[in-house]
A protein has these predicted regions:
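Intrinsically disordered, low-complexity, compositionally biased regions/tails
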Residues: 7, 16, 22, 37, ...
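Terminal beta-strand-rich extracellular "head" domains
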Residues: 66-131, 139-163
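C-terminal interaction-tip segments
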Residues: 5-7, 11-35, 39, 59, ...
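Short, conserved, surface-exposed binding loops centered on an aromatic residue
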Residues: 57-63, 78-79
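Short beta-strands within extracellular/lumenal beta-sheet-rich domains
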Residues: 43-60, 117-123
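Aromatic sugar-binding interfaces of carbohydrate-active proteins
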Residues: 1
Length: 163
């Protein structure tokens, strides 16, 4: 609705901080994630759990603040061949990762298998100062078979800045 500002900081989907204080900036920590128990990522880089509601939308009033974005995800792979999950951060994009991505997985050969292997991966992007609002998405991609876990203890997209 026009004329209303949202300030959603608690864990959940579509988190945002819709105000800016130019004269008394304080640290702002916005966290986002999907509460679905687990899902298998898609075969190409895209928004986690294929939901564009998994995003953070910070408001920046002056082009002086860096946005420090971190995405941490627990990964479980059932491996009979090479399997991997790539994690990244989409800065104003639902398909292209910015900054440092990470690939979590294992390469097996000769009939080796791993029933379940669990890792935690982290992607990071520090956005240069700019003005306006941005949509920041957690991205994932699966090669072969595996799942990722939801909930704040297993999936966390965190954006910190001063505003």
């Amino acid at each position: 609705t026009n004329g209303q500002a949202s300030c959603l900081l608690a864990y959940g989907q579509s988190r945002k901080w819709g105000v800016w204080n130019a004269y008394n900036r304080v640290p702002i920590f916005i966290k986002c994630g999907d509460t679905t128990a687990s899902w298998a990522p898609q075969g190409s880089l895209g928004v986690s759990n294929n939901s564009t509601n998994n995003k953070i939308t910070p408001t920046v009033g002056l082009p002086e603040e860096f946005l420090d974005c971190t995405f941490t995800q627990e990964v479980a792979l059932s491996i009979a061949a090479t399997s991997a999950i790539q994690l990244g951060i989409g800065f104003d994009s639902t398909t292209v990762a910015s900054g440092r991505t990470t690939i979590v997985g294992a390469a097996l050969s000769g009939g080796q298998t791993i029933t379940v292997a669990a890792w935690t991966g982290t992607a990071r992007y520090v956005a240069q100062p700019s003005i306006g609002i941005h949509n920041i998405y957690p991205l994932d991609k699966l090669t072969n078979s595996g799942t990722v876990a939801g909930g704040e203890d297993d999936m966390l997209l965190l954006v910190t800045y001063r505003g």
